C-alpha cells in the first residue's frame, strides 16, 4: 500500500512540473510574440502614441495593409522626389473636399488618409485593414461589388476598357451636427460621392526565381467627398451660385433671383416647370440616373452638366441636391438644390430647345401694345410723327374709348382740320410752365405722374347749361396787358406769433409780374388722388364737339347768370374773409386761418403751401411788368436757396381787381386786418421758413352771413373757378394734338391736380413751396398787344376758393340768385 501511495505522489509531482514548464513556455512565447508585435508596431508609419496602444490584431491588420501599399508603390514607376515635391505633399490632401481611400478587389481598405476623422469621425487606424462592407450601408453592397470588379476579358479593337468610377456610397459617420463624436453603434449614414479609377499593378518584375507568376494586383483608388446638407452650409454662396427648390417631380417651386444674371431666366417664369426642360439632351441620361440615386440615397452631386440658357446656348452647372424629409412622418417633402455655375454662356447663338425660341422670335405686337407705347413715350415727338402713326393705325383709337356713362369725343385727324387747329394753337400763347418744359431751361417733366386711366380721359371745361361760359373761356385766353397771381395756402399745425403788418405795407404789395405765377408744379402723388366720379362731375361737357377757342358775338355778363357750382363734394367755397360761425367749433387754434371747412378737420396734419406769385416789395400800378431775364434769375435764386434761409412770400392785393372798380359791379370785400404769420417748423429745421399773408377775421362768431353776400360770393367764385380751370383745360386739349409725346397729359390735368394736391398732401409732415420758372411761351403772352381787353387782374383773395362739401343745398339757385344779385346792386 505504501508503495502504491508513493508512486501516486511521484506522478502528481511530475504532472505539476510539466504544467509549470508548459506555462513557462507559453509565457515565454507570449513575451517573445509581444516583443515581435511591439517591434512590428514601431515599424509602421504611425505616431508613437498610436502604435503603442495597438493590440496584436490591429498591428497585424495595419502591417498587412502597409505591405500592400508598399507593393503597389513598388509596382509603379515612381520618380525620385525632389525637394519641391516633398514640400507639396502636405497640400495634396487639402485640395479635395474629402479623403482618399484605396480598396483591394475584395473590399479591404489598405489605405485611407488621416483626414477621414474630419469628415466621418472615425480615425485612420480604426478603418485601415478592415473591409469596407463593415462600414457601408447594406443596400449599397451590391453596387460596391460592381465597382470593385475589373473584367480582364478581351476588349474590342480600338476601344479601351472603362476604368473610371463614380458612385454614391452611404458610410457610417460618428460625427454629430455639433461636431462631437458618438459610439460606432449609434452612427448615422452619410452620403459620399466616390470618384476614382481602377488600377492594375503588374508585380511580375519582382517575382521569385522559381518561375511562379503572380497575378496582377487590382486596386480601386477613390476620393470620397461628403455632400453637405443645405442647412449646414457654412461658406456663403458666391455670385455664381443660386438656390432652387423642387417638388418630388422636379418642378420648380422656388428659384434664386441670381439665375437672372447667370442664365437670363426670371424666377417667376420657372415656377411650375420641370427642370428636365432646361437640361441639355446629351446629359439627360446621366441626370436621370443621378436623380434616381438621389431618391434612393437622399443626396447626390450631379457633376458638371449643361443647362440651357434663356436666349440660346448653355452653361456648365454642377448641382448638389438633397431630399428634405418631413419631420413627422419621415416622408420625402421636397428637393433643395445648390447650383454652381462654372462657366459663362457657351454658343449663345445656338438654339437647343423650344423654350429658347420664345426670346428669339419677335412677338406679334397687338394694338394694345402699340397704343400703350404711343401714349406712354417720354420722348418729345413732332405733330406730324404722331399724325402718321395714328393715320396708319386708326382702329387703335378704340382703346381710348371712355367707360360707360362718359361722353364720347370724336377725334378727326383730317389734314385740313389739323392744319387749321395747328394754326390756331400757334396764335394762342399757352401757359406751358407745367405742361411744357421751357426750351431755354430744358425742364424735365416725368410723364408717369400725370396720365389718367382711359376711363378718366381729360375733357374740356365746357357746359351746355351755361353757353356763355364757353365765350368767357375764349375771351380770357386772348392777350392781356395784365398778369395774374394765384396762391393756394394751407395751414400748418404749429403756430407762431403773428407779426404785425400795417395797411400801407399791404397796399404797396406789387402786382403779379408774369402769367407763370399761375402755373405751379405738383407731385406725383396726385395721380392716386383722383376718382372717376369727381372727374366726371368737374368736367361735365356738351356731347357735340366745339372749338374751345371760339367766342360768341354777344357780350354776356357772367354775373347775371346762375352760378355754376361743380358737384365736387371735397371742399367748401370759403375764403379767408367769409368764415361761417361753424368754423368756431373747429379743433384748430384760433391763430391759424383756414382755407376750407374740409381742411379744418385735418388740422392735425401738416399741409403744403403752393405759391405762384414771386416775392417782391416794389410798388406797381395797373401796368404789367414784363418778364425779363433778371426776373427769371430771381426766381432761380429762390429755388436754389438753401433750406435754412427765410423766404418771405407776400400775397398780392391788386387795386385793379377784376371785381373792383370798373371791372365789376361789386367791389371786393374789405380785407383790412391782414397780418403776416411767421410759420417756423421747428420739427423740420431744413424746411423753409415762410412768411404767409393771411386774412384776419373781422366777423363775429355769433353773426350769420347775409344771403345776398353769399350769392355775390358764389357768383364771383364761380367766375374765378371757371376762368382758371378753362385756362388749364383749354390749353391741355389744344396741345394734346400739338405735342402728344410727354406733355399733353400733364397739361390737360394740371387744373384738376391742383385741387387734389391740397387734399392729398395733408398727410405729409412738411410745408413746401414750389416755384416755377417762366417759359418762353409765357414771355410771348406778355408781349401781346395791350389794346384789347384781356385777362382780369385777380388777387390772392379772389383765387382762394374751392368746391363746397354739402353741394347746393344751402345755396341760392336760379331766380332766387338773380333777385339777390339785383338787390345787392
UniProtKB/Swiss-Prot annotation:
bHLH domain span: 17-70
UniProt cross-references to InterPro entries, sorted A to Z: bHLH_dom, HIF-1_alpha, HIF-1_CTAD, HIF_alpha-like, HLH_DNA-bd_sf, PAC, PAS, PAS-like_dom_sf
PTM annotation ((3S)-3-hydroxyasparagine): residues: 802
Region (ID): 575-784
Annotated keywords: Acetylation, Activator, Cytoplasm, DNA-binding, Hydroxylation, Isopeptide bond, Nucleus, Phosphoprotein, Repeat, S-nitrosylation, Transcription, Transcription regulation, Ubl conjugation
Motif range (Nuclear localization signal): 717-721
A GO MF term: RNA polymerase II cis-regulatory region sequence-specific DNA binding
Reported modifications of this chain: S-nitrosylation of Cys-799 may be responsible for increased recruitment of p300 coactivator necessary for transcriptional activity of HIF-1 complex. Acetylation of Lys-531 by ARD1 increases interaction with VHL and stimulates subsequent proteasomal degradation. Deacetylated by SIRT2 increases its interaction with and hydroxylation by EGLN1 thereby inactivating HIF1A activity by inducing its proteasomal degradation.
Gene3D superfamilies: Helix-loop-helix DNA-binding domain (4.10.280.10), PAS domain (3.30.450.20)
Any one GO BP annotation for this protein: bone mineralization
Protein name in UniProt: Hypoxia-inducible factor 1-alpha
Species of the source: Rattus norvegicus
Amino acid at each position: 500500500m505504501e508503495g502504491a501511495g508513493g508512486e501516486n505522489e511521484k506522478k502528481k509531482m511530475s504532472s505539476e512540473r510539466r504544467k509549470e514548464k508548459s506555462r513557462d513556455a507559453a509565457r515565454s512565447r507570449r513575451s517573445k510574440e509581444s516583443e515581435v508585435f511591439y517591434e512590428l508596431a514601431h515599424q509602421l508609419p504611425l505616431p508613437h502614441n498610436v502604435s503603442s496602444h495597438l493590440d496584436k490584431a490591429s498591428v497585424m491588420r495595419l502591417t498587412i495593409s502597409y505591405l500592400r501599399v508598399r507593393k503597389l508603390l513598388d509596382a509603379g514607376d515612381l520618380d525620385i522626389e525632389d525637394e519641391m515635391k516633398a514640400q507639396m505633399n502636405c497640400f495634396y490632401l487639402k485640395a479635395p473636399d474629402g479623403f482618399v481611400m484605396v480598396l483591394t478587389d475584395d473590399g479591404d481598405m489598405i489605405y485611407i488618409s488621416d483626414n477621414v476623422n474630419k469628415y466621418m469621425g472615425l480615425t485612420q487606424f480604426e478603418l485601415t485593414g478592415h473591409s469596407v462592407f463593415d462600414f457601408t450601408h447594406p443596400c449599397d453592397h451590391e453596387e460596391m461589388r460592381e465597382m470593385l470588379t475589373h473584367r480582364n476579358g478581351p476588349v474590342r479593337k480600338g476601344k479601351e476598357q472603362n476604368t473610371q468610377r463614380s458612385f454614391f456610397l452611404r458610410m457610417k459617420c460618428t460625427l454629430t451636427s455639433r461636431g462631437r463624436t458618438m459610439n460606432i453603434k449609434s452612427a448615422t449614414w452619410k452620403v459620399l460621392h466616390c470618384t476614382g479609377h481602377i488600377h492594375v499593378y503588374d508585380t511580375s518584375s519582382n517575382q521569385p526565381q522559381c518561375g511562379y507568376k503572380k497575378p496582377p494586383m487590382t486596386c480601386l483608388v477613390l476620393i470620397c467627398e461628403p455632400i453637405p446638407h443645405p442647412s449646414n452650409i457654412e461658406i456663403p454662396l458666391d455670385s455664381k451660385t443660386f438656390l432652387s427648390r423642387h417638388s418630388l417631380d422636379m418642378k420648380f417651386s422656388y428659384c434664386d433671383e441670381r439665375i437672372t444674371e447667370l442664365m437670363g431666366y426670371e424666377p417667376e417664369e420657372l415656377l411650375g416647370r420641370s427642370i428636365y426642360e432646361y437640361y441639355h439632351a446629351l446629359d439627360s441620361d446621366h441626370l436621370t440616373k443621378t436623380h434616381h440615386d438621389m431618391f434612393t440615397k437622399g443626396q447626390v452631386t450631379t457633376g458638371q452638366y449643361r443647362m440651357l440658357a434663356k436666349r440660346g446656348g448653355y452653361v456648365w452647372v454642377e448641382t448638389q441636391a438633397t431630399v428634405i424629409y418631413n419631420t413627422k412622418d419621415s416622408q420625402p417633402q421636397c428637393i433643395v438644390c445648390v447650383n454652381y455655375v462654372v462657366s459663362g454662356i457657351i454658343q449663345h447663338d445656338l438654339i437647343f430647345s423650344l423654350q429658347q425660341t420664345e426670346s428669339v422670335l419677335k412677338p406679334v405686337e397687338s394694338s394694345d401694345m402699340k397704343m400703350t407705347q404711343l401714349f406712354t413715350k417720354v420722348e418729345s415727338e413732332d405733330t406730324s410723327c404722331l399724325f402718321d402713326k395714328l393715320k396708319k393705325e386708326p382702329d387703335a383709337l378704340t382703346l381710348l374709348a371712355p367707360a360707360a356713362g362718359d361722353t364720347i369725343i370724336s377725334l378727326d385727324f383730317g389734314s385740313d382740320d389739323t392744319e387749321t387747329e395747328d394754326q390756331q394753337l400757334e396764335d394762342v400763347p399757352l401757359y406751358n410752365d407745367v405742361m411744357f418744359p421751357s426750351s431755354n431751361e430744358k425742364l424735365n417733366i416725368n410723364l408717369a405722374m400725370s396720365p389718367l386711366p382711359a376711363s378718366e380721359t381729360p375733357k374740356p371745361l365746357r357746359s351746355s347749361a351755361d353757353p356763355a361760359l364757353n365765350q368767357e373761356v375764349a375771351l380770357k385766353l386772348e392777350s392781356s396787358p395784365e398778369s395774374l397771381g394765384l396762391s393756394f395756402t394751407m395751414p400748418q399745425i404749429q403756430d407762431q406769433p403773428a407779426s404785425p403788418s400795417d395797411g400801407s405795407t399791404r397796399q404797396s404789395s406789387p402786382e403779379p409780374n408774369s402769367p407763370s405765377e399761375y402755373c405751379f408744379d405738383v407731385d406725383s402723388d396726385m395721380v392716386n388722388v383722383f376718382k372717376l366720379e369727381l372727374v366726371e362731375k368737374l368736367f361735365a361737357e356738351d356731347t357735340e364737339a366745339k372749338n374751345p377757342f371760339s367766342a360768341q358775338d354777344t357780350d354776356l355778363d357772367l354775373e347775371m347768370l346762375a352760378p355754376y357750382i361743380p358737384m365736387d363734394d371735397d371742399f367748401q367755397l370759403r375764403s379767408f374773409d367769409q368764415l361761417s360761425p361753424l368754423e368756431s367749433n373747429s379743433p384748430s387754434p384760433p391763430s391759424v386761418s383756414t382755407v376750407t371747412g374740409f381742411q379744418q378737420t385735418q388740422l392735425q396734419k401738416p399741409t403744403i403751401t403752393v405759391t405762384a406769385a414771386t416775392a417782391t416789395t416794389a410798388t406797381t400800378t395797373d401796368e404789367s411788368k414784363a418778364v425779363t431775364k433778371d426776373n427769371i434769375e430771381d426766381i432761380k435764386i429762390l429755388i436754389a436757396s438753401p433750406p435754412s434761409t427765410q423766404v418771405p412770400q407776400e400775397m398780392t392785393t391788386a387795386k385793379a381787381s377784376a371785381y373792383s372798380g370798373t371791372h365789376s359791379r361789386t367791389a371786393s370785400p374789405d380785407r383790412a386786418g391782414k397780418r403776416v404769420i411767421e410759420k417756423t417748423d421747428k420739427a423740420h429745421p431744413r424746411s423753409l421758413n415762410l412768411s404767409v399773408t393771411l386774412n384776419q377775421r373781422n366777423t363775429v362768431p355769433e353773426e350769420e352771413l347775409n344771403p345776398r353776400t353769399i350769392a355775390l360770393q358764389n357768383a364771383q367764385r364761380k367766375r374765378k373757378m371757371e376762368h382758371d380751370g378753362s385756362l388749364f383745360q383749354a390749353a391741355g386739349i389744344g396741345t394734346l394734338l400739338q405735342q402728344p409725346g410727354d406733355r399733353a397729359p400733364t397739361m390737360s390735368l394740371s387744373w384738376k391736380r391742383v385741387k387734389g394736391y391740397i387734399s392729398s398732401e395733408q398727410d405729409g409732415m412738411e410745408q413746401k413751396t414750389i416755384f416755377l420758372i417762366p417759359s418762353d411761351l409765357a414771355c410771348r403772352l406778355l408781349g401781346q398787344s395791350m389794346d384789347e381787353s384781356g385777362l382780369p387782374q385777380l388777387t390772392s383773395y379772389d383765387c382762394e376758393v374751392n368746391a363746397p362739401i354739402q353741394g347746393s343745398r344751402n345755396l341760392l339757385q336760379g331766380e332766387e340768385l338773380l333777385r339777390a344779385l339785383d338787390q345787392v346792386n
